[in-house]
Amino acid sequence: MTADASATGLLSVETVGTDELCDGQQLYMTLVGHSRMADADRTAILGGTFTPIHNGHRALLHKAFQTASHDGSGDGHVIVGLTSPELATETRSDPTHVEQLGAYDDRRSALASELDQLGEPYTATYEIVRLDDTQGPAATRADVDALVASPEAKAQRRAYELNQQRRDAGLHPLEIHTPPFVVAEDGTRISSTRIRNGEIDVHGRLLASE
């Protein structure tokens, strides 16, 4: 079963055409090849800090549940990797940003609550795993079928590198699913940075400037 975006409060989305894809995204499309996606019970994976959880994150999570659930025809599984404080420190140049993330256990609880609500219309189950490196279990688990990735160039490069790594290890490449950006009221995409800067709220509504 697919979720109605209007019912979840998602704002309009911005379509990313193939001519706008980064080099890595174009390249990984040639590497998909054989996968287990024909199976009714599928496993989709994605990862991030998910702090604060905003409508852009929700679009990614919805896509993961849709992919794993096979539109309601299978009992799939979603793996959500949550960035550890150590990984956040390694990958974020601004220490203030890392401090603003809050305790890992608190972030995990908030994410679990969100997943309970978002996953309700779907048949797939979910689990949250700790991410201590950028690839996480997606690089090594043979039971994973699909990766849900942001359209951001950095995320697409990692998806391409991940499939290269899996092929080198003798694993099937993952099918990559990339939902379009979710944009705020001003037509610019929703991001955690904009929320932290006080420009918008987690739903993309513009906040009054002082």
Q: Which residues are covered by each model-predicted region?
A:
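Nucleotidyltransferase catalytic core that binds NTPs
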Residues: M1-E210
